[in-house]
Amino acid sequence: MKVLVLNCGSSSIKYKLFDMDSKEVIAQGGIEKIGLKDSFLKLTLPNGEKKILEKDIPEHTVGVEFILNTLVSPEYGAIQSLEEINAVGHRMVHGGERFSKSVLLTKEVLEAFAACNDLAPLHNPANLKGVDAITAILPNVPQIGVFDTAFHQTMPEHAYLYAIPYELYKKYGVRRYGFHGTSHRYVSQRVCEYLGIKPEGLKLITCHIGNGGSIAAIKDGKCIDTSMGLTPLEGLMMGTRSGDIDAGAVTFIMDKEGLTTTGISNLLNKKSGVAGMMNGSSDMRDLEAAVAKGDPQAILTEQMYFYRIKKYIGAYAAALGGVDVILFTGGVGENQATCRAGVCEGLEFLGVKLDPEKNKVRGEEAIISTDDSRVKVVVIPTDEELLIASDTMAILDK
């Protein structure tokens, strides 16, 4: 059984082809710069070697077609024929309140998903383009949608509503939805397998820290709160996003700088966070190197970054009534020991004791707390694509 997983962004398509009998990735890659002159497909061959194939890719259907042709090509192919693809699983960003679990993509489902376009104007239309492309090229292959917002739909009303006129929620759906749900769900399930424990009774805080970052409070396997909101702009300080900011500061900046809503959105989403503090660079590795050299601006930026994560962990320990496991995932969470150490420093009052030696781990599953730490601190690399493929299989098996 082979499942193709697609993640279509506004100008990119990432893909992985899974052999679900062995849960192995047999082909993977991505297209970047769709609609621009220098678009290309970067793929990883089975031996780990990376290849770049340049091609003019004006829009998503051409991109999907290029990926499918590459999958069956004599030179780079992983399968003999496209008929070997049994199903396609799509990462769908914003399912609004309608979708609390993964579903077969029917005409009705796609119409309901398109109705959420206002909530994710960059991502949702791109997700739909991927679905349309598969429909055009492989019309008989079932397609499954896995929603980034779905896992957080178990949040109680008092956690997801904003304290603004209630009619704005009723009219426009203005509330907190949360994102990275597929990642939070994957690691929350995987950590139970890894530690040999049941989700029932477990108080878990999952920290997905990458260029974007979010934290989730998970009780009995269900999300009760998460740091991102109506959009991915709320919450943590991120690579280029501000995270939490006083709404009054937003209108103040708009007045002073003469910014439109598009202008302020651009400033807060693309020019803030680490990049805003570090003159445009959002790479945490650059920040770490600058801190090591003693750059005072870098040291301040890192303190701000760690502090915001730590503050959310404290808040979620309160929301959960305690915490049993703190989990790190995402590009930074999985690979950067300094980030994990900086975040956990000062959390001793919660029962957190980090083991400096164990914390040196990079990109592997590991317990990084001491044996006598009351709270287990764990690293679990995320695998959203595997979860999308697994959901796809589960729905087909029904």
UniProtKB/Swiss-Prot annotation:
Catalytic function, reaction form: acetate + ATP = acetyl phosphate + ADP
Gene Ontology molecular function, alphabetical: acetate kinase activity; ATP binding; magnesium ion binding
Cofactor(s) the protein needs: Mg(2+); Mn(2+)
Gene Ontology CC terms: cytoplasm
Broad class of enzyme this protein falls into: transferase
SS bond partners: none
Site-annotated residues for Transition state stabilizer: 180, 241
Residues of the active site: 148
Annotated keywords: ATP-binding, Cytoplasm, Kinase, Magnesium, Metal-binding, Nucleotide-binding, Transferase
Positions contributing to Mg(2+) binding: 7, 384
Cellular localisation: Cytoplasm
Pathway assignment: Metabolic intermediate biosynthesis; acetyl-CoA biosynthesis; acetyl-CoA from acetate: step 1/2
Single biological process term from Gene Ontology: acetate metabolic process
UniProt binding sites for ATP: 14, 208-212, 283-285, 331-335
PANTHER family tied to this protein: ACETATE KINASE (PTHR21060), ACETATE KINASE-RELATED (PTHR21060:SF15)
Subunit relationships: Homodimer.
Family: Belongs to the acetokinase family.
Name under which the protein is recorded: Acetate kinase
Species of the source: Bacteroides fragilis (strain ATCC 25285 / DSM 2151 / CCUG 4856 / JCM 11019 / LMG 10263 / NCTC 9343 / Onslow / VPI 2553 / EN-2)
